[in-house]
Design a protein with these regions (language model features):
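Long, Lys/Arg- and hydrophobic-enriched amphipathic alpha-helices
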Residues: 234-441
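Conserved acidic residues
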Residues: 177-178, 272
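Short helix/loop capping segments that flank catalytic or ligand/cofactor-binding pockets
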Residues: 43, 188-191, 284-285, 405-406
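A residue-level signal for conserved active-site and pocket-lining positions in enzyme catalytic cores
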Residues: 34, 180, 326
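Short, glycine/acidic-enriched loop or turn micro-motifs at the edges of active sites
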Residues: 146, 186, 281
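A mobile, often basic/glycine-rich helix-loop segment
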Residues: 179-238, 289-299, 435
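Rossmann-like AdoMet
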Residues: 1-111, 115-177, 345, 354, ...
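Generic recognition of stable, solvent-exposed alpha-helical segments in well-folded globular domains
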Residues: 9, 25-29, 61, 65, ...
Length: 441
């Protein structure tokens, strides 16, 4: 059964792919092509533009405040790791160590770094606020798309930290110790679209129609029914056994690429933390009967569309994360959840309210630039707007294999973030201090 029709002509590259595949492919395959194909994909080709004048806005594209608020959390985690390693930061940051070739002992790893704006802002914040820590740290950019990597290299020429670009497979060959940041990355992993036909869950596929007298157009059609091996997954999400409130035609997404992504991420980190920042809903809300067509949406030039088949390769395709699926996949991949919060709550805990208040009081000897202050105020409020970026969720994970540092080894930097000293050596193995963004503001 056809569930959606797109009236746009089918690009020749996609038409040939579909013909070579027998006429149709799972939606998951189509989404991967539309986003990550090196020549035709929105990300793979580098066609997509991020920012106020681009296709969509992200938190770092609103200005440096997001990175400035996030930096203390990342610095705290990096300092904890330094203590776990028994690393003396003063010695490690000294001239003898600086002269050594090769990777630095700590890494800030960003996956899917977009334009490179957040990586640059974080590197600058670390170098300014925690110079000893920054001297022991490098930026590792995990970017599979050549078009985006080229733009990141240009942007990060100004980075105060050394930068390396690696694919996930290469990082797994030489794992590092550090913090992994996945900001608006997992929502671009290809999802599986499924549809209830009244008796079975069916995988949705993408094909093209060839009606006489009409241009070719893309369609979503029902494919094979899901086998019994998928019932445990469906049951864990509340999709099995069938609920009569979900009538024929009810459709949604599954996230099969989360588990391999998280496992790959774990393979590249011998010891560390992981911070995922993305749109997310609990399974109860994601798969609520009243959500008739999932969360899949397309973005281009600040316009949102509910049609994922529109001009393939020219639109960003994104779907919310299911927080239950994310936490389960992380656990299976060797990560342990430290906690989660909405972005609004996280940024308030990290000092956003104080930053807003500070806009009213100019630095001694400086005049208050009202226009600049109002623009920054608007950007800060957008970061916590519950109808927008404030609805993002932050998920903090740690590797279960991370050992406690031997007592007395390692020295954290003198300019640690506020709060208890990170990861004191007296803590029992396996226990971690509460991340800063999970503390009450």
């Amino acid at each position: 059964m056809t569930t959606r029709l797109n009236e746009t002509d089918v690009p020749e590259w996609l038409r040939q792919r579909l013909l070579a595949a027998g006429g149709s492919v799972p939606f998951r395959t189509y989404m991967g092509w539309a986003l990550h194909d090196p020549e035709h994909g929105a990300y793979g080709s580098g066609r997509l533009q991020i920012g106020r004048r681009g296709d969509f806005v992200t938190s770092p594209s609103l200005g440096p405040d997001f990175a400035a608020l996030l930096a203390p959390q990342l610095a705290g985690w990096l300092a904890e790791l330094a203590v776990e390693m028994g690393l003396d930061l003063e010695e490690a940051a000294g001239p003898k160590q600086a002269a050594k070739a090769g990777p630095r002992p700590l890494a800030l790893v960003e996956t899917g770094p977009g334009e490179g704006e957040l990586a640059l802002q974080l590197a600058q914040a670390l170098a300014q606020g925690w110079p000893e820590l920054a001297a022991c740290c490098e930026l590792v950019l995990v970017e599979p798309n050549g078009g985006m990597a080229a733009r990141q290299r240009q942007r990060l020429q100004a980075s105060p930290l050394p930068c390396r670009w690696l694919r996930a497979e290469a990082l797994a060959q030489s794992p590092c110790t550090g913090v992994v940041l996945a900001h608006e990355v997992l929502d671009a992993l290809a999802v599986e679209r499924i549809r209830w036909d009244g008796r079975h869950w069916r995988q949705q596929r993408v094909t093209f129609s060839q009606e006489a007298g009409k241009p070719e157009s893309l369609e979503l059609i029902d494919g094979d029914s899901l086998g019994p091996q998928t019932e445990p997954v469906l049951e864990s999400l509340g999709l099995w056994p069938p609920d009569p409130r979900r009538g024929p035609g009810w459709a949604t997404e599954l996230h099969p690429e989360l588990a391999p992504w998280l496992a790959s991420c774990a393979a590249g980190i011998s010891r560390g933390r992981l911070l995922v920042i993305d749109y997310a809903l609990s399974a109860e809300r994601y798969y609520a009967p009243q959500r008739l067509d999932g969360t899949l949406i397309a973005y281009r030039q600040q316009e949102a569309s509910g049609d994922p088949l529109r001009q393939p390769g020219s639109w960003d395709l994104t779907a919310h994360l299911c927080s239950d699926s994310l936490v389960l996949a992380a656990r299976q991949g060797g990560w342990r959840l430290l906690g989660q919060r909405s972005q609004g709550e996280a940024l308030l805990a990290l000092g956003l309210a104080q930053r807003l208040h500070g806009l009213q009081t100019p630095v001694a000897g400086e005049r208050l630039d009202l226009a600049t202050a109002l623009a920054r105020r608007e950007s800060l409020l957008r970061l916590v707007d519950p109808a927008g970026l404030g609805a993002f969720h932050w998920f903090a994970f740690t590797r279960d294999s991370s050992p406690t540092a031997p007592s007395g080894q390692g020295r954290p930097p003198s300019s640690l973030p506020p709060g208890p000293a990170p990861y004191p050596g007296s803590q029992p193995s396996g226990e971690f201090p509460l991340p800063l963004f999970l503390r009450d503001p």
